[in-house]
Amino acid sequence: MNCWKTINLMKDYGAVRIILTAVCFMILVFISTFLAFELLRPGTSLSDEYVSLFGGLLVVILFVHKVIHVLPIICKKRKIEKKFYILRMRTWKRIPKTTMLISLVSPFLLITPVLFYAALAFPNHAHYFCMISGIHAGYCLPDFLLALKLIKAPKTAFIDQEADGLDILVEK
């Protein structure tokens, strides 16, 4: 196996650019989802109760995001544990390109529609669900950037996760 490309988002884009783009993407998604909600349910009065529940739901959504990332990879059973001194760090070895793409995009495609449906189901608290959806979309931005880089890789490529990024491997 040869390394076709190494992807490290911090080196490629920089932390400030990623954060700034993520914040802009959060705002864009919040505005678009809230406008879509207002078009579907005009004149709904919004309630500012349950702010603590909003915070708790946000934490749960970010945890569910991580779990959804891992599910496609676990289905392929490609997990290898490496020990680094006292800490154990899980790394993924030889993940097929399509599995990795599904793993990167699936949290956004699964969680965002659920949040929008929750906004429609609970219209008085729709702004909370739209905010969580926007925050989650910003949290997904690095996944989208990785997916864009992976799309350009050869079809038969494999992905190795390293401590500082991803390696795209191709067979000789």
Swiss-Prot record:
InterPro entries: DUF3267. It is found in: Cell membrane. Pfam families: DUF3267. The chain crosses the membrane at residues 18-38, 54-74, 102-122, 128-148. Its main location: membrane. One of its GO terms (cellular component) is plasma membrane. It is a multi-pass membrane protein. It comes from the Bacteria. Keywords: Cell membrane, Membrane, Transmembrane, Transmembrane helix. This is Uncharacterized membrane protein YhaJ. It comes from Bacillus subtilis (strain 168).
